[in-house]
């Protein structure tokens, strides 16, 4: 079974970590069998599964339900579950209560969004036995504050994002996930922090990659993000598409130049 120690060893060895979102048992089993290292039960289910316009309406009850479903299907992969909007920002104690529910539902790690200001919560959780994935850069729960889905950390804002990563790393984060960050900045973060980094729209030099399942299968309606590749194209089955994704991440051929944001 993949553990926090496994991810650290993969970073040290230069082996790419493959993460993919999963929301139910059948796809979890398929992805696990295809070699996906980490299954992310993302609050992206609000948009991909529930048909909402953002991740904000997703509840802790929703996240626990889908975590339980994924846990029934996965045998080897690590399961990371999102703390949903409103379930952890009020206090460290609130975050622990929500994280404990997700861990009881089958998660091996929880993911929270936010920079330096959330590092104290990261430390609070990890000191109480809950591994944390810290999500920085474009944080979808703050989409309305950002004014839309925009690349983060460009120009004069690069140092602030680096500080976010360092703060979480020093607080004991098990993983730092970067979304929509210039490739050179993501590379610098990866070289700076001791924990593994996972990227989505953050270049090819992160320690691993993640995509939303619906995006990589080409079944999400609407405009496709720059960092997305449709792995279903040219494949005869979903499992073949997932295996192709795993193979390209491991071979360091995905993401390619067309999927990367410049400074």
Curated annotation (Swiss-Prot):
Instruction: Answer whether the UniProt record assigns the keyword Cytoplasm to this protein.
Output: yes
What does the record give as its pathway? Cofactor biosynthesis; (R)-pantothenate biosynthesis; (R)-pantoate from 3-methyl-2-oxobutanoate: step 1/2
Superkingdom of this entry's organism?
A: Bacteria
Q: How is the cofactor bound?
A: Binds 1 Mg(2+) ion per subunit.
This entry's Enzyme Commission designation comes to 2.1.2.11
Recite the UniProt keywords alphabetically. Answer: Cytoplasm, Magnesium, Metal-binding, Pantothenate biosynthesis, Transferase
Q: What does this protein do?
A: Catalyzes the reversible reaction in which hydroxymethyl group from 5,10-methylenetetrahydrofolate is transferred onto alpha-ketoisovalerate to form ketopantoate.
Name of the protein: 3-methyl-2-oxobutanoate hydroxymethyltransferase
Write down the species.
Neisseria gonorrhoeae (strain ATCC 700825 / FA 1090)
The gene is panB
